[in-house]
Structure formats: structure tokens, C-alpha cells
Amino acid sequence: MWSATMERITVNLAERSYPITIGAGLFEDSAHLSSLTAGQKVVVITNVTVAPLYADKILSLLQSLGCQASLLELPDGEQYKSLDTFNQVMSFLLEGSFARDVVVIALGGGVIGDLVGFSAACYQRGVDFIQIPTTLLSQVDSSVGGKTAVNHPLGKNMIGAFYQPKSVIIDTNCLKTLPEREFAAGIAEVIKYGIIYDAEFFTWLDEHLDALYSLDEQALTYAIARCCEIKAEVVAQDEKESGIRALLNLGHTFGHAIEAELGYGNWLHGEAVAAGTVMAARTAQLQGMIDQQQFDKIFSILSRAKLPVHTPESMTFDDFMTHMMRDKKVLSGKLRLVLPSSIGTAEVVADVPQEVIRQAIEDCRTIN
């Protein structure tokens, strides 16, 4: 069912289609960059954590292709996914007199990918960029699909654009240097795909969680590829999130509220999504959409994955609602939640009674 060979997936968006290449050791091979960068001016943007690990490898590849390569290192952390850091990127590009033919590479996790993608969308009204995600979360989710953004103090990802990369290059060897907490945060998004789209994949994850945590190369390549396949299918159908793409936000309405209330960076995005997914599943159970056994399966796999599965002690129902009503899925003042309707399917539900949401939040303080 799964092998360690390199995987290649295409995101089909007509003339804006692009490849996702997945495998171990891709940083050793310039072929994946050559058609997009050979002889070009290239700016690699990364953070101070990733730069010592991988920047020299990427710069060496680019130089072997005859590129004029520059490096910009930014601070590391969700709190730096901001307009201030965006301005820092703009200043670097302007002061370097880079023209519209520059190629920008996002080398890092979700923060770098979102920030650099938004910068590429805005610089001179749009320049080419390549995603080279180095965390599991960014490899399976944020690097694919063209969502780019920075945060505002009042809400996550509120300032952004849909802007597709020219290519996504995923070297699974990056995961060997990833702290386990960051790896677990990525697993939250992996599990999400099984819950909303693929019951067979959910079962596979339940059976192979230990293999993933031991960084089994075959298991990782298969899991990442399956997530990217699902994301590519969804994005091809609904690039701008007017329909099915909203399902990818399972757990995110609750999760974004946690991140915004407790301060960006205190909870990792995937951690907040995990707790939010449990709250969404409990809401679905209270609404009669899933049964106890299905809820238990969702709770169990997230718990086994060493992720937070309870409501943060310090957050009240009102804290949640303040942030959730700013969610981008709110339409005409009505909160819309992504809820599982079984393991393998989900739907967007409007007008869930606030009493049900309150009970779900409270239940998830102590549920086990």
C-alpha cells in the first residue's frame, strides 16, 4: 500500500498548476529546482532556527545552477508572522533592487511559508515563489494550496491573499531535526485529513502512529503524500474556499481562538487544532452527527499522538466566542463550524446553538 519511493503530485489549477515532490534526500539533488531557478536571481527566506540546518545546502544547489542567491534570516516564532516582519521582507527586496523576475524561496515551517508567500504575492504585485517546507505541519498542509497571510493582534491570518507557489519540494529528511512537539503538531493536521475525507487513511494512521513517530521513511512518505493528494484534490475543486475547501478547517475555529486568546506561539498551531478538533467532534456528537464510538476514536488517536485534547483551563466560553465570531467562515453574523459527520466525512454547519457550543467547550475540560 505504501513505499519509500519519491512521490510526485500535481495541484491542478489550469495554467497555475504546480508539482509537489516528496521524498528523502531531495536537498541533495538540484534537478527539483533547475527549471524554476537556473540562472535567476533567487532570494531564500528562512528563520534563525532553520538556517543553520539547511540554508547552506539550498544555497549550494542554487549556486550550482548559476543562480545569484541571497539569504534573509528572520526571527523564529508565530509572533513574528506579522506586518512588521512583512515590512522587513519588503525592505530587503527593495534595498536589493530585486526586479519582478526574482524567485523567492520559503525555507521553513508554516510561519515562513505563509509570510514569504504573502510577501511574494505583494512584491511588485506578484513574483514567483517556491515552497520548501521543513516541518511536518507545513509539509502536509500550509505549503500546499496558496493560502498566504500574516496575523493581526485581533485575529490569525486576517491579512493575506490566495497566491499559488510554482513548486513545493518536501524532503522528509528534514523531519529528523524536528522537535517531537513540532512533529506532534503536524500529526494533528495529518489526522484531520482522515477525519474529514478518508476513513481508510484514518484507520491506517491509527495502526501506524508508532511508525510515524519513529520516523519510518516509508510511513512518512506515504502519509505526507496522501495528505497532499487530498489537499490537491480539494484545492483543485475550490481554490478560494467558497465550498469544500472550508472542510480543511476542521478544529480551526476553536483552535484559532485558543491561539489568539493565549498569545501566538504559546500553543503551537497544531496543538490548538487538536484541542479544537476534539471540541468540534464533541459538538458534532451533541448535535447527533456522530456517535460515542466515533467520538472516542477521534479523541483516542489525538491523545495517543501526544497532543492537547482538553479545553485550556484559563479560557471561558466568552473568550472563545469573542474570537470565533471573527472567524473567516462567519457569514451575515452567523458562526459556521466544520463538524465531522462520520469518520471520513465532514460538513459546514451554520447556526449551531450557542448552548451546544458552550456545553462542548465545558465537556472538553474533563473528558477522557
UniProtKB/Swiss-Prot annotation:
A single GO BP: amino acid biosynthetic process
UniProt cofactor(s): NAD(+); Co(2+); Zn(2+)
Note accompanying the cofactor annotation: Binds 1 divalent metal cation per subunit. Can use either Co(2+) or Zn(2+).
Protein's pathway: Metabolic intermediate biosynthesis; chorismate biosynthesis; chorismate from D-erythrose 4-phosphate and phosphoenolpyruvate: step 2/7
Gene Ontology MF annotations: 3-dehydroquinate synthase activity; metal ion binding; nucleotide binding
Name of one Pfam family that matches: DHQS_C
Reactions the enzyme catalyzes: 7-phospho-2-dehydro-3-deoxy-D-arabino-heptonate = 3-dehydroquinate + phosphate
Residues reported to bind Zn(2+): 189, 252, 269
Intracellular or extracellular location(s): Cytoplasm
Record-listed E.C. numbers: 4.2.3.4
GO cellular component terms listed in the entry, alphabetical order: cytoplasm
Residue numbers binding NAD(+): 76-81, 110-114, 134-135, 147, 156, 174-177
NCBIfam families in alphabetical order: aroB (TIGR01357)
Chain's role: Catalyzes the conversion of 3-deoxy-D-arabino-heptulosonate 7-phosphate (DAHP) to dehydroquinate (DHQ).
Stated family: Belongs to the sugar phosphate cyclases superfamily. Dehydroquinate synthase family.
Name assigned to this protein: 3-dehydroquinate synthase
Gene name linked to the record: aroB
